[in-house]
């Protein structure tokens, strides 16, 4: 299955595929996804947790003890907790972000959904997010989950990546196009 979807390749893809197949067999795909999303949010909020996960300086034992405490505090248990502990035992915890992303792609494919990566200069409000989801749904015919990244460097507009397609309507790109046109004309 990992070979069918380019977004789930490599080590992260193999781990995500194994986790997905187990979760599907146990009929707990949604619960595992919710737990992994909670862990991903914790990583985004805590630089210390991110450092613990990514740094090879910590021993597997130290990471394991800290991970058990973090998972217990977050209420993450069952398959997701066992899986995260397996990643730690195999010294692959540094790849957890990519594994979670690949798992999400597998879940979306399983449910007939699409995932779009959207880059914006400023956070979008709920009304704009809903409008973007509706527009993408009308194009794809599928429910669309948005992964929104804020990057002030694009100045304005947005960049949408959906599968192998990308639409770049950022102000930065438009300004670069004008700059190149002026160089060629000048």
From Swiss-Prot:
It is a peripheral membrane protein. One of its GO terms (molecular function) is proton-transporting ATP synthase activity, rotational mechanism. Transmembrane segments: none annotated. One of its GO terms (cellular component) is plasma membrane. Its main location: membrane. Signal peptide: none annotated. InterPro entries: ATP_synth_OSCP/delta_N_sf (IPR026015), ATPase_OSCP/d_CS (IPR020781), ATPase_OSCP/dsu (IPR000711). The keyword Cell membrane applies. It is found in: Cell inner membrane. Keywords: ATP synthesis, Cell inner membrane, Cell membrane, CF(1), Hydrogen ion transport, Ion transport, Membrane, Transport. Belongs to the ATPase delta chain family. NCBIfam families: ATP_synt_delta, PRK05758.3-2. F(1)F(0) ATP synthase produces ATP from ADP in the presence of a proton or sodium gradient. F-type ATPases consist of two structural domains, F(1) containing the extramembraneous catalytic core and F(0) containing the membrane proton channel, linked together by a central stalk and a peripheral stalk. During catalysis, ATP synthesis in the catalytic domain of F(1) is coupled via a rotary mechanism of the central stalk subunits to proton translocation. This protein is part of the stalk that links CF(0) to CF(1). It either transmits conformational changes from CF(0) to CF(1) or is implicated in proton conduction. PANTHER family: ATP SYNTHASE DELTA CHAIN. F-type ATPases have 2 components, F(1) - the catalytic core - and F(0) - the membrane proton channel. F(1) has five subunits: alpha(3), beta(3), gamma(1), delta(1), epsilon(1). CF(0) has four main subunits: a(1), b(1), b'(1) and c(10-14). The alpha and beta chains form an alternating ring which encloses part of the gamma chain. F(1) is attached to F(0) by a central stalk formed by the gamma and epsilon chains, while a peripheral stalk is formed by the delta, b and b' chains. This is ATP synthase subunit delta. It comes from Rhodopseudomonas palustris (strain BisA53).
């Amino acid at each position: 299955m990992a070979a069918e979807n380019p977004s789930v390749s490599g080590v992260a893809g193999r781990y995500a595929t194994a986790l997905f197949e187990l979760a599907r067999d146990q009929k707990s795909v949604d619960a595992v996804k919710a737990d992994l999303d909670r862990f991903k949010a914790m990583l985004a909020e805590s630089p210390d947790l991110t450092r613990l996960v990514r740094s090879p300086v910590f021993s597997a034992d130290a990471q394991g003890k800290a991970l058990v405490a973090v998972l217990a505090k977050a209420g993450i248990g069952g398959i997701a907790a066992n899986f995260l502990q397996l990643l730690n035992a195999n010294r692959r915890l540094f790849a957890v972000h990519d594994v979670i992303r690949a798992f999400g792609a597998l879940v979306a494919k399983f449910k007939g959904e699409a995932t779009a990566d959207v880059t914006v200069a400023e956070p979008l409000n709920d009304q704009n997010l809903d409008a973007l989801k509706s527009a993408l749904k009308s194009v794809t015919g599928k429910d669309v989950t948005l992964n929104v990244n804020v990057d002030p460097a694009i100045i304005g507009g947005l960049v949408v990546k959906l599968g192998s397609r990308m639409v770049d309507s950022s102000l930065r790109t438009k300004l670069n196009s004008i700059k190149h046109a002026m160089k060629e004309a000048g």
